[in-house]
Amino acid sequence: LPQTIFRIINGRLFDKSYPYRMIDADTALALARATELSEFVVKPARDSSGGSGVAFMDLAGLASFLPAHMRRHSDWVIQHPIRQHECMSALHASCVNTIRIITIRLSAEVSVVSAFVRIGTGTTRVDNLTAGKSIAVGVEQDGRLGRYGYDNDLRRCSAHPDHGYAFDSFVIPSFSAAQQTCIDLHQSIPDLDFISWDVAIDQQGKPVVVEFNVGRQDINTSQVCSGPVLNPYIDEVLARDRWLIIPGIGPIDRHTDIAPD
């Protein structure tokens, strides 16, 4: 995970240790100052999607940010920025281009269902598609990008619109290691069977899990980029997952089509 400096939890400040130790604002700013960083990543700790709320600020900005958000009893994490691998910067240098890797647990095994990379465009610093300024490109098993990328409006392109870099000429560094990292982490979370991981590749070529998604995840973008990604697993998924949750109705038994009392 990215290196954390301190956290805001329910409006109170805590250092990065675990168990968390409560600190005051002066101590939090001293921790930030001690990093000698010129910029910090500030992002919501929960109920965030699509890069919403993520900000980049200097120490002065951080000092102004703290009082307001402590009063609101909100939850934030303040982290070191990720410095991505030079190859990933070749795709788009203004933001960290992350790989979405989806894993599924069936029986005792965890497998990678699909992967795509989100590439920024223009001056955007957030690579999420819902921000409307990114392109998603499918990733093959060997780390090579697919031929086409798609923006949030499903417009197709074969090269980056800013600099003309052909997608299918690019291979993601350390892609195998990134997949294995997600598999290993998923193995340690036994109560979740479907997880979407956002992974960066740092300057040393090591995978860095930026975050993982267990709530508002879907496979729409994966299927646009790579086709019906659950096809190899569909029989096992349907056989195992007996209950279908229908909004407004509740759980339906796939075997009987009768909702329980």
Stretch-by-stretch model annotation:
Residues R155-Q180, Q187-L192, I201-D261:
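C-terminal active-site "lid" helix and adjoining low-complexity regulatory extension at the edge
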Residues L59-L62, L66-G149:
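Phosphate-binding site of ATP-dependent enzymes
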Residues F40, S111-V113, V208-V210:
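Protein kinase-like catalytic core scaffold
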Residues V54, T124-V126, I219-V224:
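Cytochrome P450 core scaffold surrounding the K-helix E-X-X-R motif
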Residues R46-S49, R83-Q84, A108, R118-G120, ...:
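Short, solvent-exposed loop/turn segments at secondary-structure junctions
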Residues L1-I99:
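Active-site nucleotide/adenylate-binding loops and adjacent lid/helix of ATP-dependent enzymes
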